[in-house]
Amino acid sequence: MALDRERLMQVLDRAHSGPICEPFKWDTEVIPQTIAAALRKYDLVKTCDPANPVNQSDELADRFFQAGFDVAVEVGMLCLDTQRIIKFSREEIRYGLDAAPAEFTLGEGEEKVVFRHRGLDDPFPPVWVAPLSIAVEEPLFIPIVEGILRERVVDCLEGPSLQTIWGSKLRAGSPYELLAGKLQADLNYEAIRRAGREGIGMYAVGTAPTHYGVLGGYGIPGGYKPERDIVLLLTPVEMKTTYEVLHKLCQTYNCGGITYGGSWSMIGGYAGGPEGAAVSCIACTLLLYTAYQASNGAS
């Protein structure tokens, strides 16, 4: 699904015209107070049962979803660089969900794989992506990726990330990172060749602590391919974005690609306990599909 320019510009414009909020106030007042109010409104306080961590109550799930939806509408997404809030209406968030594809593909040839929306007890098989951009030493990169890809259960590759580039320390936001984006693509392709998995889809770019890794490795000759791969847009919690993430979004638009939106609320953080973290995760996910036009994502 190609990214829509009007929706993209809407996000960028609101990042520069929305209500002002300092990050400290966002973290210590806006987020905890709004989530706590939603928990009370939907009677979700202390509903987490440690003895039953995977609660299968449809009614409880519905209340959590409505609470998360309310939080997404009320709070929006804070752009840290401008300290302005990108707000979305309830209708805009619903449209963002409706516009997300029911299915899409990554990879090419024999390695093409279908991602499809799966409901409860859905028999359609899940897609396995491995691993999660964990930093490894440079000499170990190719052997690790090759070993992973020799396991046929792996459908797509994110791969590890790099700590160094040709022996030099990799520094975020520096020219090293721009080079590292292409180097990671090169190393992945060599490991793919050795494992006999040519055409496998990839998540781009693991070695991108800022936007430069994506600019240096995605949509360029010999780099990650927009027609086959997906761009990682990992956004800060709770419900924040940055110029770095928006640069990646714009590069994806320029190259005609698709995005994965990710953001992980943690128990005990600004969202509070397990119930608050669950509500925050739902709100974040709704905003990721709305702001980033994600084809795939989670919080």
Q: What is the meaning of each model-derived region?
A:
Residues 1-220, 234-244:
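Metallocofactor- and cofactor-centric catalytic cores in central/energy metabolism, strongly enriched
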Residues 207, 217-299:
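Glycine-rich anion/phosphate-binding loop at the beta-strand->alpha-helix junction
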